[in-house]
UniProtKB/Swiss-Prot annotation:
Descriptive protein name: D-amino acid dehydrogenase
A family per Pfam: DAO
Lineage: Bacteria, Pseudomonadati, Pseudomonadota, Gammaproteobacteria, Pseudomonadales
GO molecular-function term, one example from the UniProt record: D-amino-acid dehydrogenase activity
Cofactor needs: FAD
Keywords: FAD, Flavoprotein, Oxidoreductase
Keyword Zinc included in the entry's annotation: no
Gene Ontology CC terms, in alphabetical order: cytoplasm; plasma membrane
Function comment: Oxidative deamination of D-amino acids.
Parts of the chain that traverse the membrane: none
Recorded metabolic or biological pathway in which this protein acts: Amino-acid degradation; D-alanine degradation; NH(3) and pyruvate from D-alanine: step 1/1
Length: 433
């Protein structure tokens, strides 16, 4: 059975790999010249299941208003003429309740924990190397209020069976020795010892090579135009003016997924959250991070690779704008300079931005659609690397009609009201001109 995967980021590539392992004949198509060239290229590098949390949380609307007035705020909103931007924000606000937060976080942690286990198995089976570390994640709180507010997350961690450790200042210095000189500005920390780190782009590139060895064909530099459909089936995909056909289709195009789904009548509220990163060469390994730390105040992660520090975070709701905002670089430099002033050379840092495909409830969209042969794997937000292996494995099981190892409840597109009836009311696409 032939499967056409659209997108070669970490989500599309893991989907292709697990589909090939399940015995499918897989082709991956992408407009870029290689795998992991967009959102997966320079993300924060953390595999953090326990910190899988939706942006839509109680108190966020009030915080967002305050952030709009702050120079180094973790969230910025740039008004556009795109109506989808405002619809997405309205949906996000509706998810900022305690009950919705608990439901959404449980779904995210469920998939993320499974994904971490799949990554462990993959590493054991293949020996894939990507500058990975398994030394946990430490969330730093600069105020007592932040430490107190961690209680709701701890409740979900306990419910999900995720190990954790609350740290005082001495505990912070024990797990991250380079922070010993700055613990005076911290009130405490929450550490998840089972979290991991690694270079997502390096992982994706090497997994793509392994997928090729399994028979997967990667076709780069090709423009995906639209899906051709009739009734409840996809007939093919128009790619560079030619209709390409398969038995099953997987859409893993991140923030660009809705552009192909809207003509089908599928409501996929995936919108880009623009993020930034700095990649800093390490000058003093003893004064660099040991693993990953999260700065709760600025919503920024600082991650240790072999010889580099990756500083990533921020969220701009600004449409598909990929320009580099120098103020965001200033913020990232300020944070890493505050916590690890002797760790790396900021004058040699690489500055990058990418669009993180985010749903208003934070949970990705993984699974079937109203079209019988179309499947989605998109909307992972800031957690694409964390959720990639689990999402790919889950999707491959669903396509192969195997029972997945975890519940897929609440993960597919139907939670947004997409039904078979919607698909039946969509007229077939016109013939390609």
């Amino acid at each position: 059975m032939r499967v056409l995967v659209l997108g070669s980021g970490v989500i599309g590539t893991t989907s292709a790999y697990y589909l090939a392992r399940a015995g499918f004949q897989v082709t991956v198509v992408d407009r870029q010249p290689a795998a992991a060239m967009e959102t997966s290229f320079a993300n924060a590098g953390q595999v953090s299941p326990g910190y899988a949390s939706p942006w839509a949380a109680p108190g966020v609307p009030l915080k967002a208003l305050k952030w709009l007035l702050q120079r180094h705020a973790p969230l910025a909103i740039k008004a556009t003429a795109d109506i989808d931007q405002y619809l997405w924000m309205a949906q996000m606000l509706r998810n900022c309740t305690a009950s919705r937060y608990a439901i959404n976080k449980e779904r995210m942690v469920r998939l993320s924990e499974y994904s971490r286990d799949c990554l462990d198995e993959l590493r054991l089976e293949t020996g894939i190397a990507y500058e990975g570390r398994s030394l946990g994640t430490t969330q730093l709180f600069r105020t007592q209020a932040q430490l107190d507010n961690a209680a709701k997350d701890i409740a979900v961690l306990e419910q999900s069976g995720v190990p954790y450790e609350l740290l005082d200042r001495d505990g912070i210095a024990r797990v991250e020795p380079a922070l010993a000189g700055v613990t005076g500005i911290l009130s405490g920390a929450l550490r998840l010892p089972n979290d991991q780190t690694g270079d997502c782009q390096l992982f994706t590139t090497r997994l793509a090579e392994m997928a090729v060895a399994l028979g997967v064909e990667f076709r780069y530099g090709q423009n995906i135009e639209r899906l051709d459909h009739a009734g409840d089936r996809i007939n093919g995909v128009w790619i560079d003016g030619k209709l390409e056909t398969a038995d099953r289709y997987v859409l893993a195009l991140g923030s660009y997924s809705p552009q192909l789904l809207k003509p089908l009548g599928i409501k996929a509220p995936v919108y880009p959250l623009k993020g930034y990163s700095l990649t800093v060469p390490i000058t003093n390994p003893d004064m660099a991070p040991t693993s990953t730390i999260l700065d709760e105040t600025y919503k920024v992660a600082i991650t240790r690779f072999d010889n580099r520090i990756r500083v990533g975070g921020m969220a701009e709701i600004a449409g598909f704008d990929l320009s580099l905002n120098p103020r965001r670089r200033e913020t990232l430099e300020m944070i890493v300079g505050d916590l690890y002033p002797q760790g790396g050379d900021l004058t040699q840092a690489d500055f990058w931005t990418g669009l993180r495909p985010t749903t208003p409830d934070g949970t990705p969209i993984v699974g079937a659609t109203p079209f019988r042969n179309l499947f989605l794997n998109t909307g992972h937000g800031t957690l694409g690397w964390t959720m990639a292996c689990g999402s790919g494995r889950l999707l491959a099981d669903l396509i192969a009609r195997k029972t997945p190892r975890i519940s897929a409840e609440g993960l597919d597109i139907s939670r947004y009201g997409n039904t078979q009836e919607n698909a039946q009311h969509v007229h077939p696409a016109p013939a390609h001109q």
